[in-house]
C-alpha cells in the first residue's frame, strides 16, 4: 500500500527487529514496516494509541508492525538493494530535513531543529540480538557519515542528522552475533544504506546544495548581501528591485557549474574539522579567532572569484571584503572565518558579471 500519507511494506514473513521508530519495537517479531505522514507541528501524547489507530486504518496487526513518522510525502521515499556474496540488504529511507541538528555547544537551539530521517534496513542474514545491535550501530554510523559529508550543514558546525531521526534493522532470528563493517552482512547493509540516502543528495540542484553547504536558509540570504553591495555603487536607471532579479538569474547561471559547489563543499568540510578541533596544526581557538596563520580562506575566495569572472571578479571580491571591514555587511560578520570569504567571493564575482553585462551593453 502506498499513497502520499502512508507507505506499508509487507516483509512477507516475520523478522526480529530493533527499531527506534515513532512506535519502537525492541527485539520484537515484525512483518510490516509503515511510514506515516504527519503534520510538521505534530504533537501526540499517546503515540502508542496513534500507532495502533494507524495500523488498524491500513488493516495490519499493530503488534507485528513498526511505524515511522515523517512530515514528507512518503511517495518520495528512497529505496536500494545491495547483494554481496550470499547476503541481500534492502533499505527504505524517508528524508525530511528543514534544518539539521548540529554538534556545537555554542548553538544549543539548533539541537531542536525540525526534521526526520527514517532508515529501515532489512537483511536476509540471521542474527542474534547482539548481532542485530551491532548492525544497528553500523547503520547509524553510515547515516551520520552520509549526512556529515553530503547533507545540509549548520552555520558553524557539521550535522550527523536531525533531532528526531529513527532507524530500524531487521533480520531473521539466528546465532550470528556480529554485524559490523568487517562482516558480509554489515558491508552489504552499509552499501545499500548509502545508495538509498544518495537519492536525496544527487537530486539536489546546485543552488540548494550551495546554500545547504554554507549553512544559510536560502539564496535570498546571499541576494540580500549582493543588493546591499550594489547600492554602494549603483548603475544609473537600474533600481535595486531590477538588479535583484538580474542577480538571481546570474546566481542561478553560476551555480549550474558543479565546480563551484565542489570547491565550496571541500572548504566547508575543512572548516567543520577545525571547528571540532580535529584538524592537525590548527587549534579550535585559532580557528575561532580567524588566526592570520590560516590563509586558506583567502586562497579559496580568490580562486572562486577568478574562476567566476577573472580579474574583474577578483577585484570585486576585494571590494566586498573592504566593505565588510567597514561594517557594511552584518550578515558576513556572523559567518564563520572561511564561509565569509566564500560568500564574499561569490557575491563579488557575480556582481562584477552584472556590471560587465549591463555597462558593456549600454
PLM region descriptions:
Residues 1-206:
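Alpha/propeptide regions of enzymes that mature by internal proteolysis
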Residues 244-318:
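Long, charge-patterned amphipathic interaction tracts in eukaryotic proteins
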Residues 2, 6-13, 17-20, 291-330:
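Mature-region segments of soluble proteins
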Residues 147-154, 201-204, 230, 234, ...:
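Long, hydrophobic, amphipathic alpha-helical segments used as structural scaffolds
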Residues 220, 224, 228-232, 249-256, ...:
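Extended, non-membrane alpha-helical segments enriched in charged/polar residues
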Amino acid at each position: 500500500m502506498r499513497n502520499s500519507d502512508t507507505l506499508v511494506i509487507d516483509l512477507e514473513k516475520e523478522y526480529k527487529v530493533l527499531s527506534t521508530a515513532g512506535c519502537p519495537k525492541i527485539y520484537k517479531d515484525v512483518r510490516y514496516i509503515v511510514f506515516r505522514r504527519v503534520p510538521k507541528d505534530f504533537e501526540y501524547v499517546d503515540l502508542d494509541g496513534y500507532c495502533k489507530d494507524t495500523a488498524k486504518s491500513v488493516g495490519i496487526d499493530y503488534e507485528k508492525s513498526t511505524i515511522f513518522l515523517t512530515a514528507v510525502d512518503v511517495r518520495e521515499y528512497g529505496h536500494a538493494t545491495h547483494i554481496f556474496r550470499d547476503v541481500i540488504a534492502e533499505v527504505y529511507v524517508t528524508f525530511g530535513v528543514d534544518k539539521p541538528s548540529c554538534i556545537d555547544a555554542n548553538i544549543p537551539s539548533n539541537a531542536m531543529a525540525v526534521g526526520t530521517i527514517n532508515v529501515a534496513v532489512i537483511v536476509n542474514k540471521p542474527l542474534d540480538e547482539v548481532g542485530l545491535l551491532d548492525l544497528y550501530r553500523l547503520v547509524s554510523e553510515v547515516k551520520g557519515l552520509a549526512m556529515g559529508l553530503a547533507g545540509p550543514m549548520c552555520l558553524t558546525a557539521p550535522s550527523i542528522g536531525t533531532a528526531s531521526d529513527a532507524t530500524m534493522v531487521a533480520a531473521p532470528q539466528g546465532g550470528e552475533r556480529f554485524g559490523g563493517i568487517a562482516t558480509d552482512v554489515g558491508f552489504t547493509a552499509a552499501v545499500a544504506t548509502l545508495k538509498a540516502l544518495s537519492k536525496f543528495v544527487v537530486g539536489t540542484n546546485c543552488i540548494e546544495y550551495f546554500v545547504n553547504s554554507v549553512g544559510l536558509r536560502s539564496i535570498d540570504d546571499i541576494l540580500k548581501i549582493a543588493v546591499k553591495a550594489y547600492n554602494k555603487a549603483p548603475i544609473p536607471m537600474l533600481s535595486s528591485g531590477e538588479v535583484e532579479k538580474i542577480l538571481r538569474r546570474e546566481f542561478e547561471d553560476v551555480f549550474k557549474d558543479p565546480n563551484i559547489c565542489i570547491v565550496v563543499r571541500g572548504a566547508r568540510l575543512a572548516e567543520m574539522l577545525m571547528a571540532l578541533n580535529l584538524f592537525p596544526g590548527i587549534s579550535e581557538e585559532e580557528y575561532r579567532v580567524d588566526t592570520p596563520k590560516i590563509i586558506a580562506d583567502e586562497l579559496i575566495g580568490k580562486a572562486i572569484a577568478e574562476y567566476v569572472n577573472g580579474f574583474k571578479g577578483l577585484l570585486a571580491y576585494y571590494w566586498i571584503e573592504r566593505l565588510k571591514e567597514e561594517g557594511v555587511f552584518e550578515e558576513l560578520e556572523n559567518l564563520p572565518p572561511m564561509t565569509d570569504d566564500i560568500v564574499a567571493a561569490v557575491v563579488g564575482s557575480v556582481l562584477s558579471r552584472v556590471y560587465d553585462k549591463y555597462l558593456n551593453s549600454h
